[in-house]
């Protein structure tokens, strides 16, 4: 079974149209991976679906890197 980190990276790659190999834990969605605000909304929705959790807007705004997404899912999502 894939780790949460692997699953998050796969979703990021699909949502942002980037190569999964280019995605690092410290990658910023906006600065490094070229996401815009609409991409971020879609990314959060995809993470919510994958991990069966709800990410409130105020929390979603704090998630700016791959590692922050992984950390959030680890503490709030269903494995």
Curated annotation (Swiss-Prot):
Pfam family, one: PP-binding
Compartmental location: Cytoplasm
Range of residues in the leader sequence: none
Modified residue annotations for O-(pantetheine 4'-phosphoryl)serine: 37
GO cellular component: a single term: membrane
Domain Carrier: 2-77
Disulfide bonds: none
Post-translational modification: 4'-phosphopantetheine is transferred from CoA to a specific serine of apo-ACP by AcpS. This modification is essential for activity because fatty acids are bound in thioester linkage to the sulfhydryl of the prosthetic group.
Family the entry assigns: Belongs to the acyl carrier protein (ACP) family.
HAMAP family, per the entry: Acyl_carrier (MF_01217)
Protein name: Acyl carrier protein
Organism lineage: Bacteria, Pseudomonadati, Pseudomonadota, Betaproteobacteria, Burkholderiales
């Amino acid at each position: 079974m894939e780790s949460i980190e692997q699953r998050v990276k796969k979703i990021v790659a699909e949502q942002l149209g980037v190569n999964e190999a280019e995605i690092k834990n410290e990658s910023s969605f906006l600065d490094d991976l070229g996401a815009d605000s609409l991409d971020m909304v879609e990314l959060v929705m995809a993470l919510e679906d994958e991990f069966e959790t709800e990410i409130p807007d105020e929390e979603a705004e704090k998630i700016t890197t791959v590692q922050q997404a992984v950390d959030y899912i680890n503490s709030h999502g269903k494995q």
